[in-house]
Each structure stands twice: as structure tokens, then as C-alpha cells.
């Protein structure tokens, strides 16, 4: 038997989605005391991996995230534990911004002929 009636979800604008993602990140830190520094470190290490066939594109994508986080270019090569608390906060906000925007991408991208 199917549930009938109004939709249970409402489409969110990118800004609303971003605010929600940032709010959830704040709650995870406050309620659960989660520290994702090791996950951030793994992510950055993977993005900088010189053995990856897309290493140059990965470095550019990482630079874009750092740019969105307003981290100065001369600090883009440092490790995660050298970032200030404010820089880590801005980095997570930038990553959430990309997550919100990527959700708007067309579902089936095709290469032009």
C-alpha cells in the first residue's frame, strides 16, 4: 500500500542546502563531539597523491576549495594540523558549498561531439 498525499520532501535552494549542511556540521561537533581532522587529512593526502592519474586536476580542485575557504595561496601546501581553527571551519564550509552546488549538476553529463 503506497502512502498518498503531499510530498514529504521539499526542494531546497543551494543556499538553503548549504545552510543546512553547515548547521548539521555544527551539531555533529557539539552533540557528538566528532573531530574529522583525520578525515580531512586523508582527503587532502588523496587529493595531493602524485600517483593518481588525475593528480594535476586533483590539485586544481583542492586549490579551488582552499580558494573558496579564503586560505591564502602560500598556505595551500601545509598539512591540516597547521591550519588554524578558523581556516578549518572555512574549509569545511567551502566543502559543504561544493556539496550543495554539485547536487544541482545535470544527472547525465555527456561529452560534446
UniProtKB/Swiss-Prot annotation:
Sorted UniProt keywords: Transposable element
InterPro entries in the cross-refs: DUF5347
Organism superkingdom: Bacteria
Stated name of the protein: Protein ORFc in retron Ec67
Naturally occurring in which organism (per UniProt): Escherichia coli
Organism lineage string: Bacteria, Pseudomonadati, Pseudomonadota, Gammaproteobacteria, Enterobacterales
Amino acid at each position: 500500500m503506497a502512502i498518498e498525499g503531499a510530498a514529504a520532501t521539499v526542494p531546497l535552494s543551494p543556499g538553503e542546502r548549504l545552510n543546512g549542511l553547515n548547521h548539521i556540521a555544527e551539531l555533529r561537533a557539539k552533540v557528538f563531539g566528532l573531530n574529522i581532522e583525520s578525515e580531512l587529512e586523508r582527503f587532502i593526502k588523496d587529493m595531493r597523491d602524485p600517483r593518481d592519474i588525475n593528480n594535476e586536476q586533483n590539485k586544481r580542485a583542492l586549490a579551488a576549495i582552499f580558494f573558496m575557504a579564503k586560505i591564502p595561496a602560500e598556505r595551500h601546501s601545509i598539512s591540516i594540523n597547521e591550519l588554524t581553527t578558523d581556516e578549518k571551519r572555512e574549509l569545511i564550509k567551502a566543502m559543504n558549498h561544493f556539496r550543495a552546488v554539485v547536487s544541482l549538476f545535470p544527472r547525465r553529463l555527456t561529452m560534446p561531439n
